[in-house]
Amino acid sequence: MATATRLLGWRVASWRMRPPPAGFVSQRAHSLLPVDDAINGLSEEQRQLRQTVAKFLQEHLAPKAQEIDRSNEFKNLREFWKQLGNLGVLGITAPVQYGGSGLGYLEHVLVMEEISRASGAVGLSYGAHSNLCINQLVRNGNEAQKEKYLPKLISGEYIGALAMSEPNAGSDVVSMKLKAEKKGNHYILNGNKFWITNGPDADVLIVYAKTDLAAVPASRGITAFIVEKGMPGFSTSKKLDKLGMRGSNTCELIFEDCKVPAANILGHENKGVYVLMSGLDLERLVLAGGPLGLMQAVLDHTIPYLHVREAFGQKIGHFQLMQGKMADMYTRLMACRQYVYNVAKACDEGHCTAKDCAGVILYSAECATQVALDGIQCFGGNGYINDFPMGRFLRDAKLYEIGAGTSEVRRLVIGRAFNADFH
C-alpha cells in the first residue's frame, strides 16, 4: 500500500501532531484532542495521513467553519478545492495514472472524518465530490470518460456531484421521473432532481434518468449519465436554505430538453440501477466518516470547556454527572470508529456487504446526533448560543440520519439481509 508520504509527495511537509500540553484549555474553534490510533488499529502510514490532513484543515478550514455556517456560503470554495487537490485527497481512491492517490476506503473514511471535524458542511461536499462523483467514474467509467473527467476533478479544477433524488423520489429512488429519450447520438433529458449536494457549484454531475418508462420492474429502465455544466437545457435553481450543513450548497437541477451525448452514458443503457446500488453501499461507508468527525469535534470543544467552566467552586468536569457525559460521548465515538474502520478494511479486502455499509452509517449517524445533544447539555446556556459551535454540530449531525438513505431505510436493508438468509 502506498504510504502517506508517497501520497502527499512534495506537496506538503510531513507534519506530526503532538498531544496538547498540560493545562490545555484553549477555546479556539480549531483546538484538538489527540486521537489514539493505536487503539484504532491504524498503520503508521494511515496515522501520518490523519495527522497531515488534520493539521492542514485545522489551520485552513476550522477557523472559517462558523462563518461558513452563519452565511451559508464558503466564499473561497474554488481555491480551497484546489488546495485539497494539491494535498492529494480528492482522488484518494482513484488510480495514480489519472492523478489519484491509489489508496483505499479506510483512507477515504479518515479524510472524510478529518474534514468533517473541521467543518461538517465542507466534509459533506467533499464526500459528494470524491465518492459520489469521482469514485463512480473510477468504478464505472470507460477509458475515454476517465481520461476526460478524472484529472480535473482530482486536481480540484472541477467540482463534482451526483443526482439521484427528486421531489417525489427520495427513498423510493427508482420511481424517479426524469426522462431521457434517445435521438440519434444524443439523449434528451426532461425533468428535475432535488436536494443535490454541490449542485450549484458542480462542473460534472452523475445523473440518473429513466430511459425505458415501460420497464418492469422500473429499476430496469434507469441509466446513468455524465452531465456537464453548460450543456444546453441544463440549469440549476437557487440554493436551498437548509437547517444544517450550511455552506455545502444544495439545489434543484432542471432539465429542459437537455442534450447529452450518448457517449456520456456511465456504464450501460438501462443498467444504471447497478451503478446506483453498488455505489450507494460505498457512499454510506465513506459518508459514515462524517458523523465520526462531528463527534470528535464535539469532544474537541466540550472536554476543554468542562475543565474551564466553574460552578460551586470547582471545574464542572469534576462533577460525576459531567464525567458520565464525557464517558458516554467518548465510548459512542470509539465504538462507531471501530465499526466504520473495520467495514472499510473489509471493503478494501474485497468483502463489502450492503448490510454493514448501511449499519455503519445508521449507527454512527444516530450516535452523532446524541453526542451533539450531550455536548450542548455540557455547555448549558452557552450551548444554546450561536456564538458557540455546539448547535452547528447538532444541525449538521442530523443530516446523516436523512441523506444517503434514511435511518429507516437502512434498518430495512439490514433486516432484509437477515431475512434473505431464511427465505
Swiss-Prot record:
EC number, as in UniProt: 1.3.8.4, 1.3.8.1
InterPro entries: Acyl-CoA_DH_CS, Acyl-CoA_Oxase/DH_mid-dom, Acyl-CoA_Oxase/DH_mid-dom_sf, AcylCo_DH-like_C, AcylCo_DH/oxidase_C, AcylCoA_DH/ox_N, AcylCoA_DH/ox_N_sf, AcylCoA_DH/oxidase_NM_dom_sf
Residue positions where N6-succinyllysine is found in the record: K55, K64, K75, K259, K315
Residues where FAD binds: 162-171, 195-197, 309, 320, 377-381, 406-408
Needed co-factor(s): FAD
Main location group: mitochondrion
Transmembrane segments: none
Full protein name: Isovaleryl-CoA dehydrogenase, mitochondrial
Positions carrying N6-acetyllysine: K55, K64, K75, K238, K259
Gene Ontology terms, MF aspect: 3-methylbutanoyl-CoA dehydrogenase activity; flavin adenine dinucleotide binding; identical protein binding
Gene Ontology CC: mitochondrial matrix
The protein's assembly and partners: Homotetramer.
Presequence extent in this chain: 1-29
Active site as annotated: E283
Pathway as given in its UniProt record: Amino-acid degradation; L-leucine degradation; (S)-3-hydroxy-3-methylglutaryl-CoA from 3-isovaleryl-CoA: step 1/3
Source species, domain of life: Eukaryota
GO biological process: branched-chain amino acid catabolic process; L-leucine catabolic process
Subcellular compartments: Mitochondrion matrix
Organism expressing this protein natively: Pongo abelii (Sumatran orangutan)
Reactions catalysed, as given in the entry: 3-methylbutanoyl-CoA + oxidized [electron-transfer flavoprotein] + H(+) = 3-methylbut-2-enoyl-CoA + reduced [electron-transfer flavoprotein]; pentanoyl-CoA + oxidized [electron-transfer flavoprotein] + H(+) = (2E)-pentenoyl-CoA + reduced [electron-transfer flavoprotein]; hexanoyl-CoA + oxidized [electron-transfer flavoprotein] + H(+) = (2E)-hexenoyl-CoA + reduced [electron-transfer flavoprotein]; butanoyl-CoA + oxidized [electron-transfer flavoprotein] + H(+) = (2E)-butenoyl-CoA + reduced [electron-transfer flavoprotein]
Keywords (A to Z) from UniProt: Acetylation, FAD, Flavoprotein, Mitochondrion, Oxidoreductase, Transit peptide
Sequence positions that bind substrate: S171, S219, R220, Y274, D281, L282, E283, R284, A404, G405
Family to which this protein belongs: Belongs to the acyl-CoA dehydrogenase family.
Record function comment: Catalyzes the conversion of isovaleryl-CoA/3-methylbutanoyl-CoA to 3-methylbut-2-enoyl-CoA as an intermediate step in the leucine (Leu) catabolic pathway. To a lesser extent, is also able to catalyze the oxidation of other saturated short-chain acyl-CoA thioesters as pentanoyl-CoA, hexenoyl-CoA and butenoyl-CoA.
